[in-house]
A protein has these predicted regions:
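Acidic, low-complexity Ser/Thr/Gly/Pro-rich repeat segments typical of extracellular/periplasmic
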Residues: 1-181
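C-terminal segments of large proteins
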Residues: 181-190
Length: 190
């Protein structure tokens, strides 16, 4: 619903997920609008409302994903309005022996990690139209160098900054995951 209003509550909100970014809207509250006391507004109220740009964001599947090698599936990185027009990532082919000491690509203190620290990650440029989601497809077979295998990955980007205690602080979401291409089993999706 576009309008969010609750009974006995004096605030009416617009659902921001239903509005387009960087767009002018004209909002009209009708003259016949009645409050809980039965009072009628009497004449329409017209407001101009300008939405802003989408906040920078990045999204990447995390955790463990298993895909059939018979399909050419890829790892998708979704971005929008990244302020530095780039993300950082690292990829590592996982050997079965690597999984003896860890079961995840997430970094752990005082344990063996599959991936290097994010200071060593490579930067990748992202270009896209403002306020439009850009999909970057990571070719798994190419990264694996094989039709089957497991790949560990980490991805991060600066998305926005805020001020905390008088200092600017970047929001830098991080995503970690493992993706396996296999020719064993049956692929089921639900």
């Amino acid at each position: 619903n576009l309008i969010i209003a609750y009974e006995n509550y004096n605030i009416v909100r617009l659902n921001p997920w239903l509005l387009e970014p960087d767009t002018n809207y004209k909002i009209t509250i009708g003259a016949n609008t009645k409050d809980k006391f039965g009072q009628i507004l009497g004449k329409p109220v017209v407001l101009d409302y300008q939405t802003g740009d989408l906040l920078g964001d990045i999204s990447v599947p995390s955790g463990l994903n298993i895909f059939p090698s018979s399909q050419d599936l890829q790892l998708n990185i979704s971005t929008v309005n990244l302020p530095e027009s780039e993300y950082q990532a690292t990829y590592k082919v996982v050997q079965p022996t690597d999984l003896v000491y860890t079961e995840s690509a997430y970094p752990r203190n005082n344990r063996k990690n599959l991936l290097p620290t994010n200071e060593k990650w490579q930067k990748y440029p992202v270009s896209g139209e403002k306020n439009k989601i850009t999909e970057v497809a990571i070719p798994l077979r190419e990264k694996l160098g094989s039709q089957t295998g497991m790949l560990a990955y980490g991805v991060q980007a600066r998305t926005s900054f805020s001020e905390q205690n008088g200092q600017e602080k970047w929001q830098e979401p991080e995503f970690y995951g493992l993706v396996q291409l296999t020719n064993l089993g049956v692929f089921a999706q639900w």
